[in-house]
Amino acid sequence: MAIHLYKTSTPSTRNGAVDSQVKSNPRNNLIYGQHHCGKGRNARGIITAGHRGGGHKRLYRKIDFRRNEKDISGRIVTIEYDPNRNAYICLIHYGDGEKRYILHPRGAIIGDTIVSGTEVPISMGNALPLTDMPLGTAIHNIEITLGKGGQLARAAGAVAKLIAKEGKSATLRLPSGEVRLIYKNCLATVGQVGNVGVNQKNLGRAGSKCWLGKRPVVRGVAMNPVDHPHGGGEGRAPIGRKKPTTPWGYPALGRRSRKRNKYSDIYILRRRK
């Protein structure tokens, strides 16, 4: 990813560092509209996820997470920006005339060839079952349920590692540090997701943040007591509690949010960091 630094001509361009290399030119048969409703609200209109709302209109790009074009080679035609995710996507033209979007693997360029199947080379962008991969392979877009499509390691720069195979299961180390068992016939894509330097971008101004649908963040201590447990007081008062809390009074900053006794706990060998 090429980071573009602006010449300092205005306050908004002084700190801006954006990626201006990848453009978006989606195909009409692979996009459809989506109705954005809620803006962080639930069915009763109550805010459940803060700092969301507004933003530019988006068209959803249909991504092929299943990679079920078996044993048919495809060629990367374009690398495009997707407003619905922080990773890039690339358009694939398959030999049978099929055209699909997939997540852009790191290092893939226009003209490269990819293929999906059981006996395919262990090369970047190819999709194959975990049982056919050697130990230590870097992978992304990993299935949890066979045939459902990739659900793990799909964000920009995400990569998991195959560390063991035993019986019907394969052991993976996920980007979060979690070590987990996956059915070894599940499909995964070789390589790392592209756009690794996404965290190096600096939008430079509040307006660019608003285009992404992200509202301003206000500290709890700057609110009134009716709005936040940290609010109120005379001047710069402390929060008045032993530990910080969410706007709804639950413990914040480090409390684990995973449900207890979940059915998938038996597949997790080591929890995430």
Curated annotation (Swiss-Prot):
Main subcellular location: plastid
Single annotated GO MF: structural constituent of ribosome
Location relative to the cell: Plastid, Chloroplast
Keyword Ribosomal protein: yes
Any coiled-coil regions, as ranges: none
GO cellular component, one term: chloroplast
Acyltransferase found in the keyword field: no
GO biological process: mitochondrial translation
Alphabetically ordered keywords of this record: Chloroplast, Plastid, Ribonucleoprotein, Ribosomal protein
Chain spans, region Disordered: 1-22, 223-254
Subunit structure, as described in the record: Part of the 50S ribosomal subunit.
HAMAP family (alphabetical): Ribosomal_uL2_B (MF_01320_B)
NCBIfam families named in the record: rplB_bact
Family statement drawn from the similarity comment of this UniProt entry: Belongs to the universal ribosomal protein uL2 family.
Stated name of the protein: Large ribosomal subunit protein uL2cz/uL2cy
Organism: Drimys granadensis
